[in-house]
From Swiss-Prot:
Listed PROSITE patterns: DHODEHASE_1, DHODEHASE_2
Localization per record: Mitochondrion inner membrane
Binding site for substrate: 128, 173-177, 251-256, 331-332
GO-annotated molecular function: dihydroorotate dehydrogenase (quinone) activity
Protein's name in the database: Dihydroorotate dehydrogenase (quinone), mitochondrial
Organism: Kluyveromyces lactis (strain ATCC 8585 / CBS 2359 / DSM 70799 / NBRC 1267 / NRRL Y-1140 / WM37)
Record-annotated active site: 254 (nucleophile)
PANTHER family: DIHYDROOROTATE DEHYDROGENASE (QUINONE), MITOCHONDRIAL, DIHYDROOROTATE DEHYDROGENASE (QUINONE), MITOCHONDRIAL-RELATED
Length: 445
């Protein structure tokens, strides 16, 4: 019966004219008489519209860096409003994505037993509450870290608390762990997973990562409430997010929560991280939100760049003793380097952590020192601070970073920066005839 349908249809097409065929079969025929010039106009219009749609939705478009991002900064004098607007665009699918995102094999790296197609991550602080995970990952990142998330909701410090230093490609923030709290963020992550499981994408059951992408990872950065307990708040974080994170990050280095950086002292940090690892291990058989029967997310600790060598050595010892899986170097700095171009002393002297290009020398120095004291330990080092190019990424890798993270440069340059960094990194690696994995720690071997 099915094989006869095309034969009958073709016979009708040959024995009836077009109008008779459409009327006889209850369809409305297309209006005849579209002139050549009109048809050309329609065709050109559709072509231009399609090209414009592709161009503006593609993160590689220069429009985003040179037009859209400057416009957003212009209409949001308070940098925090710009931050919120950016997250709104990313959350609602209005931000451009990286079309044809096929990472070159030289960028592939295995971290914590899992493959990433590229080692470029989005640092914590951009998406504090996990609202825009898909919008960010679709821009080409290989990893995203949301948070910091605190056990209870808290507003953070009073506004204004986020300041741009555009001449330096830098920002100062004193957000103070503003967070929706564990329950809200867990609900957001669970809703995302539920939608994914109910969609066609999960039918082949091939996605194991909680990022919901085959070769990308999701990290959750854990913080403490302003008046919270310095140990229990982190243990609550592990309990809340063990099922939802590919990676757990213990943030003991934000300069905007009173007393937090004191947790970096060796004895205190060793005790904290030992308890965190024990809590993680006790929950392994609870599985994860995708249905895995066991789940053991690696634990990383994020530290400050404002440390002398002896302090870095003691943190390395704490990390080894507690058996965490890695260290992120680094958070923002409370220093104001003399290299700053910004002359507005009121702006430069704002309290808070400085991030962006001026942070790079401090973060890189701290990374090299940390690599020196963790060599041979198996600890994974993640570089973060002032990265804005492929050359920067290469420099951090050679200093010991298996992966790098960025945020401030992304905010200034727009979503196209990720493709640019990956392209530049690929080109530089091929010039050396090496892969990313081969250059990790090259300068400290």
């Amino acid at each position: 019966m099915n094989s006869g349908f095309p034969r009958i249809l073709s016979k009708k097409l040959f024995t009836l004219n077009q109008s008779q065929f459409f009327v006889k079969n209850g369809m409305v025929p297309l209006k005849a008489g579209i002139s050549g010039p009109k048809l050309l106009k329609y065709t050109v219009g559709i072509a231009i519209g399609s090209f414009a749609g592709f161009y503006f939705s593609n993160s590689r478009s220069a429009f985003h860096e040179y037009v859209l991002c400057p416009m957003l900064r212009l209409v949001t004098p308070d940098a925090e409003d710009g931050h919120k607007l950016g997250i709104w665009f990313l959350k609602n699918g209005l931000a451009p994505r990286l079309w044809f995102d096929n990472d070159d094999k030289v960028l592939n790296v295995n971290i914590f037993g899992k493959k990433l197609t590229n080692p470029i991550g989005c640092a914590a602080g951009l998406d504090k509450n996990g609202d825009a995970i898909d919008g960010i990952l679709s821009g080409g990142f290989g990893y995203i870290e949301i948070g910091s998330v605190t056990p209870l909701p808290q507003p953070g410090n009073p506004r204004p608390r986020f300041f741009r230093l555009p001449l330096d490609d830098a920002v100062i923030n004193r957000y103070g762990f503003n967070s929706s709290g564990h329950d809200t963020v867990v609900n957001t992550l669970q809703s995302r997973i539920t939608s994914f499981i109910n969609s066609y994408m999960f039918k082949d059951n091939s996605v194991e990562n909680l990022s919901l992408y085959k070769d990308k990872l999701l990290g959750v950065n854990l913080g403490k409430n302003k008046t919270g307990d310095e140990v229990q708040d982190y243990l609550k974080g592990v309990e809340s997010f063990q099922k939802y994170a590919d990676v757990l990050v213990i943030n003991v280095s934000s300069p905007n929560t009173p007393g937090l950086r004191s947790l970096q002292k060796e004895s205190i940090l060793t005790d904290l991280l030992t308890q965190v690892v024990a809590k993680r291990d006790s929950l392994v058989t609870s599985g994860n939100a995708l249905g895995a029967k066991t789940h053991k997310p690696p634990v990383l600790v994020k530290v400050a760049p404002d440390l002398v060598e002896e302090e870095i050595k003691s943190i390395a010892e704490a990390a080894k003793k507690s058996k965490v899986d890695g260290i992120i170097i680094s958070n923002t700095t409370i220093q104001r380097p003399t290299t700053l171009i910004t002359e507005d002393s009121d702006l430069v002297s704002q309290a808070g952590g400085l991030s962006g290009k001026p942070l790079k020398p401090l973060a890189l120095k701290a990374l090299k020192t940390m690599a020196k004291y963790t060599k041979g330990s198996g600890l994974v080092l993640v570089g973060c601070g002032g990265i804005s190019s492929g050359a920067d990424a290469i420099e951090f890798a050679k200093a010991g970073a298996s992966m790098v993270e960025l945020y401030t440069a992304y905010a200034y340059k727009g979503p196209g920066l990720i493709a640019k960094i990956k392209d530049e990194t690929t080109e530089l690696l091929k010039k050396e005839n090496k892969t990313w994995s081969e250059i990790i720690g090259e300068d400290i071997k």
